[in-house]
From Swiss-Prot:
The keyword Transcription regulation applies. This is Transcription factor dbaG. It is found in: Nucleus. Signal peptide: none annotated. Coiled coil: none annotated. Transcription factor that coregulates the expression of the gene cluster that mediates the biosynthesis of the antibiotic 2,4- dihydroxy-3-methyl-6-(2-oxopropyl)benzaldehyde (DHMBA) and its derivatives. Specifically positively regulates the expression of the FAD-dependent oxidoreductase dbaF. Induction: Deletion of the conserved eukaryotic csnE deneddylase subunit of the COP9 signalosome leading to defect in protein degradation results in the activation of the silenced dba gene cluster. Expression is positively regulated by the dba cluster specific transcription factor dbaA. Expression is also controlled by the transcription factor flbB. GO terms for cellular component: nucleus.
Length: 420
């Protein structure tokens, strides 16, 4: 390719076809074993071929690919092509959402999700983007609450516009083995959402008096839910659990590890969906432990939290062990080098960074997580933004605080990829 501009002697139609292929490679995970994995955007390629290569869904895929590669390669020509496609799609999507008589179908939902991902890719420190508008549009089409919890409940209820047949009536984060008491991860996450809302009501408003009985009951409920998650993790079958493939020693060349090189174990998984499910469960436990410690400090400032802090270090360490799997193209080659080069030589597919984005950000914001681990996670987010072409990762890495609904809408859009 020239420094910037279209490749010589290649027609626009072929450039768009290549962009479509790039999207399928970069963002779609087709499950090899459907007993273990739901995949990610796994039904999108057949859908595009059914609807046509110039359909709105196909053009939304191209817009995402042009934007992502334009950012990674510093090619304004590519980002401009993505921008043109994006704006062409906006009008038709808005009309479909505003006019129920047109009959919103699965293709409209998918287009809204993809345009939301486009906004997340194009976001940056000075331009947070408008992905929340597309999350709101998707929620309006599905007639659900505009939140990850609303989407989770729709998947569990078998919403008619949920595309991935493996998810309908089964939930979103399904594993071969239920947890303790037969609870699925989805069930536990719904309870966690309710618990979070209750804790925000009690603890976020200094004008509301705190009563011992309410705080004690909330801590007991939080502790019980943490136990449920422990049981869920222990109940999983060996073929669903991570497998250790290597170990990274501390680098003699760096005071603090670069992205992917936290010293310790390196794990592999069935696929990125399974890795994502595990990290959702881990960060959920970190959130619960953070709340337990916070409540305990109010109820009894002298209480000992050492075991909880050890648990958090172990959970975050397990997330770190999954990061090379998410971020590298060839995990075997990465491990074989054993940190000889303290930089990831061959970045993996952007979908790995996308699935990792929100669990890592949540963990990086929890006071119970040690500062050195928080700093490492911010490095990983910045790396995802730079080398995987997901601009919102840079914003999450550097913004001192991200507005709650902005974050929730991004999480909702990423989770929506499990439904397609």
């Amino acid at each position: 390719m020239p420094e910037d501009g279209p490749p010589k002697d290649i027609p626009d139609g072929l450039i768009e076809e290549l962009a479509l292929r790039a999207f399928f490679h970069d963002y779609c995970v087709v499950p090899v074993n459907t007993a273990l994995s739901r995949g990610y955007l796994g039904g999108l390629e057949p859908m595009v071929h059914r609807l046509g290569l110039q359909s709105p869904v196909a053009n939304a895929c191209k817009a995402v690919a042009f934007a992502s590669h334009g950012l990674k390669l510093s090619r304004p020509f590519l980002t401009k092509k993505g921008e043109i496609l994006y704006h062409e799609l906006l009008g038709s999507l808005a009309r479909s959402i505003q006019n129920p008589a047109l009959g919103a179908g699965p293709d409209i939902v998918v287009t809204a999700v993809l345009l939301g991902l486009y906004e997340m890719i194009m976001a940056g420190e000075s331009n947070p983007g408008h992905h929340n508008a597309h999350a709101g549009g998707m929620a309006a089409i599905l007639q659900i609450e505009n939140s990850p919890l609303g989407l989770l409940q729709a998947a569990r209820a078998g919403h008619p516009l949920v595309l991935n047949r493996m998810v309908q009536n089964n939930g979103m984060f399904i594993s071969p083995s239920p947890g303790g008491g037969g609870q699925s991860l989805d069930t536990i996450l719904v309870k966690l959402g309710s618990l979070w809302q209750k804790s925000e009501t009690l603890l976020s408003n200094p004008q509301i008096p705190l009563f011992f009985d309410e705080l004690y009951a909330l801590r007991e409920e939080t502790t019980a839910l943490n136990r449920d998650l422990i049981l869920w993790q222990k109940a999983q079958s060996d073929n669903f659990k991570p497998t250790k493939v290597g170990y990274l020693s501390p680098s003699p060349y760096q005071l603090s590890p670069s992205a992917g090189f936290w010293p310790g174990q390196v794990d592999t998984y069935v696929d990125l969906y399974v890795a994502g499910v595990w990290n959702v469960s881990r960060v959920a436990r970190c959130f619960l432990i953070n709340l337990i410690v916070r409540l305990s400090n109010i109820l009894d400032p002298t209480s000992d939290h050492r075991q909880y802090h050890n648990d958090v270090r172990e959970l975050v360490g397990d997330i770190f062990a999954s990061i090379p799997f998410h971020l590298t193209e060839d995990l075997g080659a990465f491990v074989a080098k054993r940190g000889a080069n303290p930089e990831i030589a061959n970045p993996g597919r952007p979908v790995g960074g996308l699935i990792l984005l929100h669990p890592v950000y949540i963990a990086s914001q929890l006071p119970v997580v040690p500062p050195d681990m928080q700093e490492y996670m911010r490095k990983c987010l910045a790396w995802i933004g730079k080398y995987m072409g997901i601009g919102q990762a840079c914003l999450l890495a550097k913004a001192p605080r991200v507005e709650g609904q902005y974050f929730a809408c991004g999480c909702m859009l990423v989770w929506a990829g499990l439904l397609i």
